Amino acid sequence: MNIRRKNRLWIACAVLAGLALTIGLVLYALRSNIDLFYTPGEILYGKRETQQMPEVGQRLRVGGMVMPGSVQRDPNSLKVTFTIYDAEGSVDVSYQGILPDLFREGQGVVVQGELEKGNHILAKEVLAKHDENYTPPEVEKAMEANHRRPASVYKDPAS
């Protein structure tokens, strides 16, 4: 192999290594910004296709209905705890902040936060359903069977 071919080979290897390093760093940086969507049942039992359950400390978005009678407000702060449910289960959520004006029991919400031990969500953001005609597609798909069932049938299997 002559010197010219060797130099081209080294340059090609260096470009490929640089490209691989760049892709790896971009994916690592984006990893902290990716929030996966789950329903309460998927947190308890895993995603349907893969049966993969979220890990403690994982950032995620959870969509469900606010269970009637579950909203508890701390009178000395802005801390609120409530339960969201779907056809397969329920999870507890705690949130520190001002809730959206449209937030109420029996209404659809999407919470964004971290999963803690005991299937508890520490929410950083709470989004309430905007009006009667719009539901995010993920929530609508997960909630289509819930409107006819009473909230009392949704219990956490761990309790």
Swiss-Prot record:
Intervals, Periplasmic compartment: 30-159
Gene Ontology process terms (BP): cytochrome complex assembly
Membrane topology designation: Single-pass type II membrane protein
A molecular function (GO) term: metal ion binding
GO cellular component, as recorded: plasma membrane
Stretches with biased composition (Basic and acidic residues): 132-147
Localisation: Cell inner membrane
Binding, heme: 130, 134
Keywords tagged on the record: Cell inner membrane, Cell membrane, Cytochrome c-type biogenesis, Heme, Iron, Membrane, Metal-binding, Signal-anchor, Transmembrane, Transmembrane helix
Topology Cytoplasmic: residue spans: 1-8
TM helices/strands, residue ranges: 9-29
Region Disordered: start-end pairs: 132-159
Organism superkingdom: Bacteria
Similarity comment: family membership: Belongs to the CcmE/CycJ family.
Primary role: Heme chaperone required for the biogenesis of c-type cytochromes. Transiently binds heme delivered by CcmC and transfers the heme to apo-cytochromes in a process facilitated by CcmF and CcmH.
HAMAP family recorded: CcmE
Name of the protein this chain belongs to: Cytochrome c-type biogenesis protein CcmE
